[in-house]
């Protein structure tokens, strides 16, 4: 499938300046300043003066990092170049999460595959410790040849997952019908590269080929426009936190979901024989 670049349509939704008293921006962030390596020893490396980070996985261990700061609402962008070649069995996770048994979490997970087969991007949203809201997509480009931008926009109304500024998923605030929404717990940014060959590729049928190790993923151009620590829901009229998708972005979202979605928990009647989750019963097409 040919890669198509759509960088302009969605960006206009997020250009309004953030309130200086409660917001912070990190443009082209420095990995030394913004993140800590949390595990993996020498398998996680920061170089190019803090502008590039790599995570590696070998048979002994994977590796990971997390942000120094916590955030509540905002837009997070990171460019990744995923594990090349036979990446079957590996998972590169990039997500936001709070801590504790009732944690909130917003997930991108990239499931490796055999050479020539497409990567799968696995998304999930946890609220108050409960997940089971998976949607999965094939990527419509080779994510190992070049860097691509993976973004989360999180505001009191919705969570938007984007790839190269194209929305692939929207999780709307459905508190009005009793569905918890992540809005009170600040989250850190995490990423890790690890072995998950018990489930990641074809349900665990394809195992990691350790003769191809080490497996390496690369990160650059971290950018955050977020609340740090605490933030109110009132951002002022016209602020980006209250924006909705425009018509072009809705078309792009429908295009992705029609052509590349391979799993949607909101249509899995076998998994939920007693009824789909409440948010799936709403008429919105963009859950």
Swiss-Prot record:
SUPFAM superfamilies assigned: Concanavalin A-like lectins/glucanases (SSF49899)
Enzyme class, UniProt record, top EC level: transferase
Site (Important for catalytic activity): 107
Induction: In fruits, expression is decreased by gibberellic acid (GA3) or 1-methylcyclopropene (1-MCP) at the beginning of storage (until day 6). Expression in harvested fruits is increased by low (0 degrees Celsius) temperature treatment, particularly at the end of storage (day 32).
Pfam families in alphabetical order: Glyco_hydro_16 (PF00722), XET_C (PF06955)
Annotated signal peptide: 1-28
Modified how: Contains at least one intrachain disulfide bond essential for its enzymatic activity.
EC numbers, comma separated: 2.4.1.207
Keywords noted in UniProt: Apoplast, Cell wall, Cell wall biogenesis/degradation, Disulfide bond, Fruit ripening, Glycoprotein, Glycosidase, Glycosyltransferase, Hydrolase, Secreted, Signal, Transferase
Binding site for xyloglucan: 109, 122-124, 132-134, 198-199, 203, 271
Keyword field contains Glycoprotein: yes
Family matches, as InterPro entries: Beta-glucanase/XTH (IPR044791), Beta_glucanase (IPR008264), ConA-like_dom_sf (IPR013320), GH16 (IPR000757), GH16_AS (IPR008263), XET_C (IPR010713), XTH (IPR016455)
Record-annotated active site: 105 (nucleophile), 109 (proton donor)
Subcellular location: Secreted, Cell wall; Secreted, Extracellular space, Apoplast
Annotated glycan sites: 113
Domain GH16: 29-219
Cellular component GO terms, alphabetical: apoplast
PROSITE patterns xref list: GH16_1, GH16_2
Summary of the tissues where the protein is detected: Expressed in fruit pulp. Expressed in leaves, flowers, calyces, stems and fruits. Highest expression in leaves and lowest in fruits.
UniProt catalytic activity: breaks a beta-(1->4) bond in the backbone of a xyloglucan and transfers the xyloglucanyl segment on to O-4 of the non-reducing terminal glucose residue of an acceptor, which can be a xyloglucan or an oligosaccharide of xyloglucan
Entry annotated with the keyword Thylakoid: no
Gene Ontology annotations of biological process type: cell wall biogenesis; cell wall organization; fruit ripening; xyloglucan metabolic process
Family: Belongs to the glycosyl hydrolase 16 family. XTH group 2 subfamily.
Protein's name according to its UniProt entry: Xyloglucan endotransglucosylase protein 1
The organism of origin for this protein: Diospyros kaki
Gene of this entry: XTH1
């Amino acid at each position: 499938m040919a890669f198509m670049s759509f960088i302009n349509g969605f960006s206009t939704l997020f250009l309004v300046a953030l309130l200086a008293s409660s917001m912070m921006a990190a443009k082209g962030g420095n990995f030394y300043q913004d993140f800590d390596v949390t595990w993996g020893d020498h398998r996680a490396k920061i170089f190019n003066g803090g502008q590039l980070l790599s995570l590696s996985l070998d048979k002994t261990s994977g590796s990971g990092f997390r942000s120094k700061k916590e955030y509540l609402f905002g837009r997070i962008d990171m460019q990744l170049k995923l594990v090349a070649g036979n990446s079957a069995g590996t998972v590169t996770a990039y997500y936001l999460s709070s801590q504790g048994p009732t944690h909130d979490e917003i997930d991108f997970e990239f499931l490796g595959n055999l050479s020539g087969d497409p990567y799968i991007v696995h998304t999930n949203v946890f609220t108050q410790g409960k997940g089971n809201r998976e949607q999965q997509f094939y990527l419509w480009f080779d994510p190992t040849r070049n860097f691509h931008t993976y973004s989360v926009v999180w505001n009191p109304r919705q969570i938007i997952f984007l790839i190269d500024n194209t929305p692939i998923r929207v999780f709307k605030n459905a508190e009005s019908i009793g569905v918890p929404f992540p809005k009170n717990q600040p989250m850190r940014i995490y990423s890790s590269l690890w072995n998950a060959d018990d489930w990641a590729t074809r349900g665990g049928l394809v195992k990691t080929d350790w003769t191809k190790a080490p497996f390496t993923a690369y990160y650059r151009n971290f950018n955050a426009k977020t609340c740090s620590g605490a933030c109110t829901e009132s951002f002022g009229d016209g602020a980006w936190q209250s924006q909705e998708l425009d018509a072009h972005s809705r078309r792009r979202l429908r295009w992705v979901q029609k052509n590349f979605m391979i799993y949607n928990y909101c249509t899995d009647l076998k998994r939920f024989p007693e009824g789909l989750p409440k948010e799936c019963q709403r008429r919105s097409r963009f859950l």
